[in-house]
Amino acid sequence: GSSPVGTYEHLVEMYENGDLDFSQVTTVNLDEYKGLAGSDEQSYRYFMNTHLFHKININHANTYVPNGTEPDAEKACQAYNELLHKIGPADIQILGLGHDGHIGFNEPSDHFENETHCVDLTETTIQANKRFFDSEKDVPKQAYTMGIGTIMRCRKILVVVSGKDKAEILKQVIQGPVTPEVPGSILQFHPDCTIIADEAALSEMAV
């Protein structure tokens, strides 16, 4: 989503100032819409290229995003799982938080999915993301997403949350019970998770 855009802007600025070198960095993205090619302006590959990869000295061959053009969901997910196991746990994972508590495209469910899988997007997610498309009917109904188990194996997690509209769900994620109905709540069990939020997003918190 758009939550980390400000983070990417700072990373680009630090690179331009000579403070960061991305030549040895490998990135793995959380998710991609099923059916969208990397050249599609609404794809997450295009988003990452535009906001980060094409502005820094990263080796493009070391930037990985699920293959949205693979119509066979099982094949697409297996390929990404094999890649993730080969690379190993990420040193740092940057997450946003959906209005319904989803992380990546791990939507509210009756169970946590461990590995990369194909998910049917909820109406809440479709409504939240339609602003990026010409019309609501253009929003893909499915996506490939990294699983909760893979996310939890990352060594450090940063969650970026902003806005009053995220206040109630952020409260549930931090102070509510751990449940797959609020996927982000699983982060309570991560040994090194930091949440970066503005005052509006924290306005429902009891401290």
PLM regions with names:
Residues 100, 104-148:
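Class I SAM-dependent methyltransferase SAM-binding "motif I" and its flanking Rossmann-like core
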Residues 19-21, 57, 84-88, 112, ...:
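Solvent-exposed alpha-helices and their adjacent loops that cap or buttress functional pockets
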Residues 9-20, 44-46, 108-118, 178:
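A glycine- and small-aliphatic-rich helix-loop capping segment at beta-alpha/alpha-beta transitions
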Residues 2-7, 82-108:
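A glycine-rich beta-strand to alpha-helix segment
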Residues 1, 29, 66-67, 94-97, ...:
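Short beta-strand segments
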Residues 149, 153-207:
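ATP/nucleoside-binding phosphotransfer catalytic cores, i.e., glycine-rich phosphate-binding loops
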Residues 69-72, 134-140, 173-175:
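Short, flexible loop segments at the rims of nucleotide/cofactor-binding pockets, characterized by
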